[in-house]
């Protein structure tokens, strides 16, 4: 007999947790749609030459290549060596680039898309790191140009999502790659690849600490003078406290003697984002400037975001993203700038569960169980269930008569809150009895008012959370 087991690096949940996970997906989707984003889904596998055009090195080593055994057999029989190679997507950004380039003339720009699907990476399986995981992305794609105002709107989306998720206080940390690049230019670190390498090291500051970054930048790989490294560390230590302080920090940078044109461009973009964020109604306690945020990916060119939970910094970034100038340069001659964010929901959910932050009030998606006393009561039970479902109550029917105590036990174990009973006495009076297992109360209600009464009870419970 084969031992049942899941592959390493996958997250498989029991129904109680899956409901909580699904609720988070629903909240994210609802907020994405409220801000006018349209749903997109792309195939789980892509042609490998398309998928891997922009990648290489570590990314390519993590890709899962796939091919059907039938296709391989047919190719072997026919001697066809041109069988297209397929690969599972490792993020949602590259498939988006392909999608926009392929459908460019059918889309309306700026194109506002959200995508919530699983992606696959052959990473080393470890706690909290998955080979299959959900990403929940939004992007706004422009044609030729895209106003920095969209960068502010994306920040407002982040705030709306995590406010409704109610997983604790959070901070949206903002920076701009032009601001970083301009400051490094003023220190003589202007060469492209070298500057990108420094940015990657700076991005490790919160995870590895100042001593690690200092040793790395002074060391043989970079050889930056110690005095300049200290200036870099002082610069990236800047954190704003409130909206006015953020604007003051930017004004001071702009007025500095060593301020370069690139730095001033970054300051101007951040200033406009901050002013619009305030107009969008995001409270100043929800965001701050953090000059150490660089985002390790090379394609970010302007605004960058990272979001963290205030009381659980050990969880790390729960949402990140930024501005890029040319999404689909490998697939289209059109210039397609954009801005977007991604929520790695599988890892976030795992971290929240480990920290005890998952709300388990809804142990089941079933809200009512219609009990069955005897075979003669089956038609009545089915009629009651029909009425409940028509009234918006998720309902299960007990299909075989059992002792009422066992039916209560089943409902309690399954996490079903209400048990509806209709014996001969209740039927004669046109009512049903309802056992509320959450409040440990029993009451009677007319059949016509049953669904509306349960909806009120459920709404009151949600309001108390």
UniProtKB/Swiss-Prot annotation:
InterPro entries: aa-tRNA-synth_II, aa-tRNA-synth_II/BPL/LPL, Anticodon-bd, Anticodon-bd_dom_sf, His-tRNA-ligase, HisRS-like_core, HisRS/HisZ, HisRS_anticodon. It is an enzyme of class 6 (ligase). SUPFAM superfamilies: Class II aaRS ABD-related, Class II aaRS and biotin synthetases. It comes from the Bacteria. Pfam families: HGTP_anticodon, tRNA-synt_His. It is found in: Cytoplasm. Belongs to the class-II aminoacyl-tRNA synthetase family. GO terms for molecular function: ATP binding; histidine-tRNA ligase activity. It catalyses: tRNA(His) + L-histidine + ATP = L-histidyl-tRNA(His) + AMP + diphosphate + H(+). Keywords: Aminoacyl-tRNA synthetase, ATP-binding, Cytoplasm, Ligase, Nucleotide-binding, Protein biosynthesis. This is Histidine--tRNA ligase. Homodimer. The keyword Cytoplasm applies. Its EC number is 6.1.1.21. One of its GO terms (cellular component) is cytoplasm. GO terms for biological process: histidyl-tRNA aminoacylation. Its main location: cytoplasm.
């Amino acid at each position: 007999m084969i031992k049942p087991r899941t592959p390493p690096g996958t997250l498989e949940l029991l129904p109680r947790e899956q409901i909580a996970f699904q609720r988070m997906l629903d909240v994210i989707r609802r907020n994405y749609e409220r801000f006018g984003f349209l749903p997109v889904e792309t195939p789980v596998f892509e042609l490998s030459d398309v998928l891997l055009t922009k990648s290489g090195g570590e990314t390519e080593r993590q890709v899962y290549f796939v091919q059907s055994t039938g296709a391989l057999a047919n190719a072997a029989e026919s001697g066809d060596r041109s069988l297209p190679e397929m690969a599972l997507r490792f993020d949602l950004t590259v498939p988006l680039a392909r999608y926009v380039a392929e459908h460019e003339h059918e889309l309306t720009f700026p194109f506002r898309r959200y995508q919530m699907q699983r992606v696959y990476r052959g990473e080393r399986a470890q706690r909290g790191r998955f080979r299959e995981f959900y990403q929940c992305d939004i992007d706004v794609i422009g044609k030729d140009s895209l106003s920095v105002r969209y960068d502010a709107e994306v920040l407002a989306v982040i705030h709306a999502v995590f406010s409704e998720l109610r997983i604790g206080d959070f901070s949206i940390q903002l920076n701009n790659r032009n601001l970083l690049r301009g400051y490094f230019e003023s220190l003589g670190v202007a060469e492209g690849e070298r500057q990108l390498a420094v940015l990657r090291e700076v991005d490790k500051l919160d995870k590895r600490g100042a001593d690690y970054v200092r040793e790395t930048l002074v060391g043989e790989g970079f050889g930056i003078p110690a005095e300049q490294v200290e200036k870099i560390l002082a610069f990236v230590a800047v954190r704003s406290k409130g909206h006015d302080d953020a604007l003051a920090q930017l004004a001071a940078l702009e007025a500095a003697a060593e301020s370069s044109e690139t730095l001033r461009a970054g300051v101007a973009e951040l200033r406009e984002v901050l002013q619009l964020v305030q107009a969008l109604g995001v409270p100043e306690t929800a965001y701050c400037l953090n000059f150490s945020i660089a985002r390790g990916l090379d394609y970010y060119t302007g605004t960058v975001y990272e979001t963290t939970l205030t009381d659980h910094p050990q969880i790390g970034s729960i949402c990140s993203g930024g501005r890029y100038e040319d999404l689909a340069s490998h697939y289209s001659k059109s210039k397609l700038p954009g801005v977007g964010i991604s929520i790695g929901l599988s890892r976030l959910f795992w971290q929240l569960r480990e920290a005890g932050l998952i709300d388990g009030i809804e142990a089941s998606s079933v809200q009512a169980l219609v009990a069955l006393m005897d075979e003669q009561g089956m038609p009545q039970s089915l009629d009651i269930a029909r009425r409940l479902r028509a009234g918006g109550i998720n309902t299960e029917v007990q299909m075989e008569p059992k002792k009422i105590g066992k039916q209560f036990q089943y409902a309690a174990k399954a996490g079903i809150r209400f048990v509806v009973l209709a014996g001969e006495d209740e039927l004669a009076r046109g009512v049903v009895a309802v056992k509320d297992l959450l409040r440990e109360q029993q009451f009677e209600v007319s059949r016509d008012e049953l669904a509306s009464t349960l909806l009120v009870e459920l709404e009151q419970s949600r309001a108390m959370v």
